């Protein structure tokens, strides 16, 4: 999942500005990535993250938003449920590596999330990962195979 050659401006902001910028979510947002999708100027405008978050939340948000950047950079045209599911799943893998009681709580919350896009998306991605032998490269290859032709 190489995105090391991309400049990604990250800006910490307050809740009000962040939620004003993210008009589409219709809910509480604590991180978002603003993209320029015009082919002539395609790129990452900036990543906005709410200020003063606890470490575990900050890390999962940065992971989540970096996965959106990776998906954008690789021109994947995934349905929202698959894209958000992959983002949530990558957060989950990081939480798993933390091996703390707090990380375990956040992992459990991902399984219990009732939102169709985020919760079902996560559970579908997690199930596919297990079905594919718990191999992240195979999971990514499967998602890449869905790339829209240009």
Task: Tell where the protein language model's regions lie, with residue ranges.
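Short pre-active-site segment immediately N-terminal to the catalytic Zn-binding motif
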Residues: 41-62, 74-78
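Intrinsically disordered, low-complexity, Ser/Thr/Glu/Asp/Lys/Arg-enriched terminal regions and linkers
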Residues: 51-52, 69, 89, 93
């Amino acid at each position: 999942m190489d995105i090391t050659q991309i400049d990604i401006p990250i800006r910490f902001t307050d809740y009000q500005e962040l939620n004003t910028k993210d008009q589409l979510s219709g809910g509480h947002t604590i991180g978002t990535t603003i993209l320029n999708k015009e082919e002539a100027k395609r790129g990452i405008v900036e990543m906005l993250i709410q200020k003063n978050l606890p470490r575990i939340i900050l890390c999962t948000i940065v992971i989540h938003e970096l996965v959106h950047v990776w998906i954008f950079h690789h021109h994947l045209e995934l349905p929202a449920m698959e894209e958000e599911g992959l983002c949530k799943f990558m957060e989950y893998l990081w939480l798993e590596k933390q091996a703390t009681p707090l990380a375990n709580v956040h992992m459990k919350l991902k399984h219990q999330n009732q939102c169709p896009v985020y919760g079902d998306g996560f559970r579908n991605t997690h199930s596919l990962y297990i079905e594919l032998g718990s191999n992240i490269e195979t999971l990514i290859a499967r998602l890449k195979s869905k790339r829209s032709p240009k």
